[in-house]
Amino acid sequence: MAIINMSDLDLQGKRVLIREDLNVPVSNGVVTSDARLRASLPTIELALANGAAVMVMSHLGRPTEGEYNPEYSMQPVVDYLAKALSCPVRLATDYLDGVDVVVGEVVVFENVRFNVGEGKNNEALSKKMAALCDVYVMDAFGTAHRAQASTHGVGMFAPIACAGPLLAQELDALGKALDNPARPMVAIVGGSKVSTKLTVLESLSGIVDQLVVGGGIANTFIAAAGYNVGKSLYEADLIDEAKRLVANAKSRGADIPVPTDVVVAGEFSPIAAATLKSVSEVADGEMIFDIGPDSAEALAKIIASAGTIVWNGPVGVFEFDQFGEGTKRIAQAIADSKAFSIAGGGDTLAAVDKYGIADKVSYISTGGGAFLEFLEGKELPAVAMLEKRGV
C-alpha cells in the first residue's frame, strides 16, 4: 500500500488534525530549544494555506498519564506558535467530546498524555480523537515507533489518515540511505554501550561497507581485538558478540576498523588531563575517552570516499573539548563529503550543532528512538498504520 501524503489532498474547509512532535524543553514557561517547533511549522502553514481548520496535538515531557500537571502544559508551545504563525492560535483543554475550530485558525490540544489510555493505544480514546477530524495527519517521526492513541489508534479510525511533509521527508531520506544506498556505504555508530545498540550494529553490519564504532562501544571492540582498555567503560560479556560482528563483516568484504591510537585520562572530568597513546599502551588505571588523530584521519579518509554516510553517535566524550577532537574531525569529514549523509540521535545532533555543520549534512533526522528502530530494520507502528490506510 502506498502512503497518502497530506500534500496530495484537498484540505479546503476540512477539519485537519495534525500529530506533531512538539516535545520541547521548557523553563519558567518559556520554550528553551525550538528546533522541533521550527520543523513543524511548514506542515501547519501548508494546511492553513490550503484552507483547513487546523488542530495540532503532541505530548510534552513525561507526566503521569491521566493527570493534569501544569508543568507539562502545552501553553508555552501555544505562546511560541502564536508568534510564529500569522493566525489565531489557542489551547483547548477539554477537546475529546468536540472542539470548535474554524478555517484559518490553529487549535492546539492540551498534552495528549493527560488522557487516560494514550500510552496503551486505547481504542475508545482513539475513536474520540478520530471523530474530531476529517483528515488525520501523522507528522511526528520522533514518535512513529510508538503505538499510542495519538500516533497510531486515531489513524486507524479517522476518515482519512496521511503522512505530513516532515514525516514523508524522514522516510524518503532514510529509505535513500538504507534501501538503495550509493556505495561505499559508511555507518558511524557511537554511544556508551554495545548492548543498547546491538541490533543496530547487527543490522548495519549486514549492509554497510565500513562500520565505524565509537565511544564506549569502540572500547568493547578494542578489548575484543586483544588490547587492554584499563578502567574504560566496556562490556566484557559482549566481547564474543563484537568478535562475531567483525567476522561477519569480514566475510562479506566489509570492515569494522579498531582505533590505532586513543586519548586517555585517569578520571572522567571536564578538567581531566588528556594523554595520547597507542591503543596497545593503555595502562590499567586509564580510561579511553576519544580516538587519536591517526585514527581520526584514517576514518576521515573512509568518509571522504563514501557514497552514503549514516551517523548515529559521537566517537568520544566531545562535551569535554580535550576529548572532542575525534568527533570534530569526523564531523568535518562529513561536512566536506559529497556523499548523501544522514545524522540522527540526540548526542549526534548536539555534535552537529557544536561543530556548526548542520547545513552540510544532507538530512538531519528529528527522531531519536524512531531513527534507531528504523536503522534496526524494525517496523514503525505509525508507518505501518499509514500503509494500511493508504491507497
Curated annotation (Swiss-Prot):
It comes from the Bacteria. Belongs to the phosphoglycerate kinase family. It comes from Shewanella baltica (strain OS155 / ATCC BAA-1091). This is Phosphoglycerate kinase. It holds the Pfam family PGK. It catalyses: (2R)-3-phosphoglycerate + ATP = (2R)-3-phospho-glyceroyl phosphate + ADP. GO terms for biological process: gluconeogenesis; glycolytic process. Keywords: ATP-binding, Cytoplasm, Glycolysis, Kinase, Nucleotide-binding, Transferase. Its EC number is 2.7.2.3. Monomer. It is found in: Cytoplasm.
